[in-house]
């Protein structure tokens, strides 16, 4: 049995501070539409010590809808954890769709692998156990113009998001989308100072404040910052 919705509200980062409204969204719109294998993976992940890293079910539906609306086929995922967003993407892609998934910890990915296999989408995924920057640099050298990617989703080490952006804005095609997760960071980015955070959390918070300012001024993309989950920023490449 997975964590209750009340537990979910307490342990997961969220922008929506009304737990009753969050429960309503999850129970009414998200969970009834959640794929069986995504539900199983979510329930397993909610028992994990790093369960707060789980992409929420309502955000998963948002990502799936966007991928389908774009008719995306080639995607990149940086930061996999147990693979909830990865499985979401794989299910949304067509049968010949491909995902290059990069994470430093394969053991977390292996938690989700049985659910990916049961869903019949393992063939769409190329998992690479590595730091992301060297892999992206290699991809930049090897990827031809006609093989650029349609979509990228980043949910990894927060201090490197700006570095990932510089690579992804070249790897994703013009008109393609780059999504950054957690960009509102509990809502704490609204304040110049936010006492009480763990030092690592504060580093991430400041990184996101800098990233948000940078993306808003980047002429290569147009952006929309969506207050779902812990905040998702969508960048559409312009040139």
Curated annotation (Swiss-Prot):
It comes from the Eukaryota. Keywords: Alkaloid metabolism, Metal-binding, Methyltransferase, S-adenosyl-L-methionine, Transferase. PROSITE patterns: SAM_OMT_I. Its cofactor is Mg(2+). SUPFAM superfamilies: S-adenosyl-L-methionine-dependent methyltransferases (SSF53335). One of its GO terms (molecular function) is metal ion binding. The keyword Metal-binding applies. The keyword Metal-binding applies. S-adenosyl-L-methionine binds at residues 55, 77, 79-80, 85, 103, 132, 157. This is Norbelladine 4'-O-methyltransferase 4. It comes from Narcissus aff. pseudonarcissus MK-2014.
């Amino acid at each position: 049995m997975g964590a209750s919705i009340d537990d979910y509200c307490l342990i997961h980062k969220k922008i929506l501070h009304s737990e009753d409204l969050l429960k309503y969204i999850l129970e009414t719109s998200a969970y009834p539409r959640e794929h069986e294998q995504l539900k199983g993976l979510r329930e397993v992940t909610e028992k994990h010590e790093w369960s707060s890293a789980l992409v929420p079910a309502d955000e998963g539906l948002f990502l799936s809808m966007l991928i389908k609306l774009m008719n995306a086929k080639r995607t990149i995922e940086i930061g996999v954890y147990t693979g909830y967003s990865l499985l979401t993407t794989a299910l949304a892609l067509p049968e010949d769709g491909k995902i290059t998934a990069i994470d430093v910890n394969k053991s977390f990915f292996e938690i989700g692998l049985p659910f990916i296999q049961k869903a019949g989408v393992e063939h769409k995924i190329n998992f690479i156990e590595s730091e992301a920057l060297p892999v992206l640099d290699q991809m930049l050298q090897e990827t031809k113009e006609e093989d650029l990617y349609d979509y990228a989703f980043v949910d990894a080490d927060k201090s490197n998001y700006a570095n990932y952006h510089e690579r992804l804005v070249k790897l994703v095609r013009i008109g393609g989308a780059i999504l950054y997760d957690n960009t509102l960071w509990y809502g704490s980015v609204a304040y110049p100072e936010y006492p009480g955070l763990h030092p690592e959390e504060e580093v991430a918070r400041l990184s996101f404040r800098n990233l948000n300012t940078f993306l808003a001024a980047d002429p290569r993309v147009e952006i929309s910052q969506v207050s779902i989950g812990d905040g998702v920023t969508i960048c559409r490449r312009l040139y």
